[in-house]
């Protein structure tokens, strides 16, 4: 089970009724199902902030020391490393080491972390990239969940692995690769 708490701090998010707890749970479940490590965990928790340029700018400055609005920020609750994950039946190579869950407390429960989305940046990007707002949001949600479980894009190898996972998960929802449009 995935518990999702959503805080909407910006009225324009109300225009996107399709972005709701049910959608976020479905996307989160599909993303986590890519890894055998999470199959034993019975309950996940995820907090979502749907906000505006002003608040995301404040968060980006406070936590990343970048004075610029961004589309999404991810705040992992745990220090995980993607190289410790076991992929479920896809082609991406990784280690077969079990992820260490003992230090997370109750192994039946895992707080994934917090994600903050900026409506205006996502809206502008989706317009510029000729995507629907919802599809762009779904892509950013998958991207953010991968960050919460230890993925990053600090080098070309990590970037390619992360992008391939995103493309694979998006395809499950009938969404084309977002990287074909922006590269």
Swiss-Prot record:
Binds 1 zinc ion. GO terms for cellular component: cytoplasm. It is an enzyme of class 3 (hydrolase). Its cofactor is Zn(2+). It comes from Rickettsia bellii (strain RML369-C). Disulfide bonds: none annotated. GO terms for molecular function: metalloendopeptidase activity; RNA endonuclease activity; zinc ion binding. This is Endoribonuclease YbeY. Single strand-specific metallo-endoribonuclease involved in late-stage 70S ribosome quality control and in maturation of the 3' terminus of the 16S rRNA. It is found in: Cytoplasm. InterPro entries: MetalPrtase_cat_dom_sf_prd, YbeY, YbeY_CS. It comes from the Bacteria. Gene3D superfamilies: Metalloproteases ('zincins'), catalytic domain (3.40.390.30). GO terms for biological process: rRNA processing. Belongs to the endoribonuclease YbeY family. Zn(2+) binds at residues 143, 147, 153. Its EC number is 3.1.-.-. Keywords: Cytoplasm, Endonuclease, Hydrolase, Metal-binding, Nuclease, Ribosome biogenesis, rRNA processing, Zinc.
